């Protein structure tokens, strides 16, 4: 068993930092209701290196939203996870084919240099200092900006953005 101490999320350039999965899931479900999300009208959530988060996240997500359809590039390396409620997770690492630091280069909110000290024991109740909070914010806001930049540079929108860099290259050929 494990737990996450932060579920930072960027929605249209606005960052929220729920500390508990239940709070994050309720936020996502509220957005789904407000935006009338369905299997045909999806809420797409990008996670950089979804495969890394997969083992932990899939347990929480399937308990909450049921089984999902998954598209894998390799065993335990999902490209997408689609739930029947219209929520779809996509791996932005496959889209950019580069680290989050490299994907966010030139963005207003680049990934912060250095890593958090992962030897520090944190729970959802552990206060985040300013540096830790900024690190969480920059990760998701920088990713949002990088995706927006890619959409603008290639004439895509959320519905037409390819799943992977390979698909992007094929479209340009």
Task: Report each predicted region and the residues it spans.
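Residue-identity detector for glutamine
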Residues: 8, 59, 97, 171-172
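Common nucleic-acid-contacting/processivity interface regions adjacent to the catalytic cores
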Residues: 121-173
């Amino acid at each position: 068993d494990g737990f996450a101490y932060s579920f930072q999320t960027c929605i249209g350039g606005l960052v929220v930092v729920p500390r508990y999965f239940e709070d994050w899931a309720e936020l996502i479900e509220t957005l789904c209701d407000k935006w009338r999300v369905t299997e045909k009208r999806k809420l797409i959530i990008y996670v950089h290196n979804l495969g890394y988060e997969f083992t932990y996240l899939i347990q929480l997500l399937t308990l909450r939203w049921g089984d999902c359809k998954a598209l894998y590039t390799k065993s335990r390396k999902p490209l997408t996870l689609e739930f029947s409620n219209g929520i779809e997770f996509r791996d932005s690492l496959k889209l950019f084919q580069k680290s989050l630091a490299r994907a966010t280069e030139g963005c207003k909110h680049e990934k912060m240099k250095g890593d958090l000290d992962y030897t520090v024991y944190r729970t959802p109740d552990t206060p985040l200092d300013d540096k830790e909070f900024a690190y969480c914010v920059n990760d998701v806001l920088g990713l949002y900006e990088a995706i927006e930049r890619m959409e603008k540079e290639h004439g895509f929108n959320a519905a037409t953005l390819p799943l992977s860099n390979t698909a992007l290259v094929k479209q340009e050929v």
